[in-house]
């Protein structure tokens, strides 16, 4: 048995991450998570209607309950980076070599698209500022003049607005170097793509300095962004701008993206589960704060504090911002195109606090910073997941390379290249954007299922290992129950975003099998690195002892059954 002791800052060995931060540093690196609410706030309103605010509140509460399991298992591994996926993978290793790497892979699949999705939205904000689309109304002088022209006799104001908007739209907004389709999605090398590439390279250069430099930069940006988000969540309540009628009737929509109220029937519940499914991608994401355990000066103290304080921040912001958005904008406003695709969120936030002119410009700039913060959080977390997966023998060896600053640069380059491909898809249209988001979230739900159940598996197989912090057993049990609830969300709700999302997500998750086989059987000769189980005081031969018996296998079968049954029962 290996005792877990307090680890102070020491000189790192060559090729290792550096112990340079405390829980506050991880908190600020994870402070980009609240900005993820802005990725899909309109999309969830479009699928759930007047209950959208409740979807967000419920989802973040579920995430907070689940975090107790993650905090406990993270304490078992003070020398590992990469987050809950890495810690949970070790629990499943006794029962299957192939299930364990699935945890690491699916967590990476969930986190890495934040780079491309965030860059596409931020690029859209920048493009709108540099080359805005003109706005006209029925009483605009240009519209009146267009209708008065004899050549337009019999035309309507709608025709006039469409024609004038098309004529006044800058050519750069329609320009693309190349475009096409890839199965159910499109791709485009347009202006949004190229601006997004620049933003991605900026984030890469900041991350290249190592975790301490990243945490310091994100602390500054985090304060700039979090405070305005709190203002947006509080000011409309204090100034009486909330229209309480915007929360009723408390029923789902009849059909997605239609303002017609529906009923609590199968179709209605399907849309609700679709909202819960996609909200989980944002609301559970503060677990990334424990990706940095091997970079904590004192992992025994810092790990649990990092995830719980990050969770409380998300609880506040994920409750306030959707609540005030809906209360001020109403369902019609939330279903507006610029809100659904994210490009008009900054302008809406400025109006909510009574801003205009320069205030609107400042709010849009803050929105760009919020997205950059989320992108930095994603690159920091996902690259460390790849790094630790490589160190532990799950993923190819090259991913374990770090630079002199202690940054996992090989993993970061992999993130960058993969997301350039995703960015071309996300920049094409909203349908392609939400397809990436839904497929990514299938990976996240699979990761979530495996790691919530890893809590009780570790209790059975590694109960003798001292834990720096031990969660109340009721939270371990609750986490197990919620793993099946989340599986139901995926089975029932993924189809809401794209008919192929669930199956594409399963295929994406299965890609780890050839990757793992290459590393394990080709590069490592069928053996795991000796240090992989050091924290648990085990050797590879000890993995044959399976105290949980068939329970983990029954859990997997039950999880698959829940997904398939939910997919069959709940239809639109």
Label each residue range with its predicted role.
Residues 21-39, 67, 193-202, 235, ...:
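Hydrophobic, membrane-embedded alpha-helices of multi-pass small-molecule transporters
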Residues 38-146, 173-183, 187-191, 313, ...:
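Extracellular loop-to-transmembrane helix junctions
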Residues 1-53, 57, 63-71, 79, ...:
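Membrane-interface "cap" regions at the ends of multi-pass membrane proteins
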């Amino acid at each position: 048995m290996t005792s877990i002791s307090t680890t102070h800052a020491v000189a790192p060995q060559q090729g290792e991450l550096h112990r340079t931060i405390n829980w506050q540093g991880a908190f600020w690196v994870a402070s980009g998570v609240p900005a993820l609410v802005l990725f899909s706030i309109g999309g969830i309103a479009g699928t759930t209607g007047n209950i959208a605010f409740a979807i967000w509140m419920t989802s973040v509460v579920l995430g907070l309950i689940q975090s107790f399991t993650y905090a406990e298992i993270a304490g078992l591994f003070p020398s590992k980076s990469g987050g809950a996926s890495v810690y949970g993978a070790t629990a499943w290793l006794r029962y299957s070599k192939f299930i364990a790497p699935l945890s690491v892979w699916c967590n990476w699949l969930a986190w890495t698209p934040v780079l491309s999705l965030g860059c596409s939205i931020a690029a859209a904000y920048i493009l709108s500022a540099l080359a805005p689309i003109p706005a006209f109304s029925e009483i605009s002088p240009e519209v009146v003049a267009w209708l008065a022209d004899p050549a337009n006799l019999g035309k309507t104001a709608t025709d006039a607005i469409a024609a004038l908007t098309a004529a006044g739209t800058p050519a750069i907004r329609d320009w693309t170097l190349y475009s096409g389709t890839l199965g159910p999605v499109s791709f485009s090398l347009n202006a949004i793509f190229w601006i997004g590439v620049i933003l991605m390279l900026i984030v890469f250069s900041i991350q290249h300095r190592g975790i301490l430099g990243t945490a310091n930069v994100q602390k500054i940006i985090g304060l700039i962004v979090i405070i305005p988000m709190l203002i947006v969540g509080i000011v409309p309540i204090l100034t009486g701008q909330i229209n309480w009628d915007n929360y009723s009737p408390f029923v789902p929509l009849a059909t997605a993206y239609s303002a017609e109220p529906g009923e609590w029937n199968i179709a209605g519940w399907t849309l609700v589960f679709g909202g819960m499914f996609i909200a989980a991608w944002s609301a559970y994401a503060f677990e990334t704060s424990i990706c940095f355990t091997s970079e904590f000066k004192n992992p025994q103290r810092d790990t649990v504090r990092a995830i719980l304080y990050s969770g409380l921040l998300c609880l506040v912001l994920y409750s306030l911002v959707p609540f005030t958005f809906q209360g001020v904008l109403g369902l019609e406003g939330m279903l507006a195109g610029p809100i659904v695709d994210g490009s008009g969120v900054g302008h809406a936030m400025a109006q909510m606090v009574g801003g205009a002119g320069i205030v609107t410009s400042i709010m849009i700039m803050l929105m760009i910073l919020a997205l950059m913060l989320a992108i930095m959080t994603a690159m920091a977390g996902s690259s460390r997941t790849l790094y630790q997966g490589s160190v532990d023998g799950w993923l190819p060896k090259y991913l374990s390379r770090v630079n002199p600053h202690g940054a996992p640069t090989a993993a970061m380059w992999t993130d960058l290249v993969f997301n350039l491909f995703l960015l071309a898809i996300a920049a094409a249209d909203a349908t392609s954007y939400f397809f990436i988001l839904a497929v990514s979230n299938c990976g996240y739900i699979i990761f979530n299922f495996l790691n919530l159940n890893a809590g009780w598996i570790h209790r059975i197989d590694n109960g003798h290992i001292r834990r720096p912090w031990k969660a109340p057993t009721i939270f371990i049990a609750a986490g197990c129950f919620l793993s099946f609830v989340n599986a139901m969300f995926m089975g029932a709700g993924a189809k809401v975003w794209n008919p192929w999302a669930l199956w594409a997500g399963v295929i994406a998750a299965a890609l780890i099998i050839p990757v793992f086989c290459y590393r394990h059987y080709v590069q490592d000769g069928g053996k795991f690195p000796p240090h992989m189980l050091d924290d648990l005081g085990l050797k590879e031969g000890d993995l044959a002892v399976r105290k949980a018996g068939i329970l983990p296998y029954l859990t997997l079968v039950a999880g698959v059954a829940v997904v398939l049954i939910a997919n069959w029962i709940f239809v639109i």
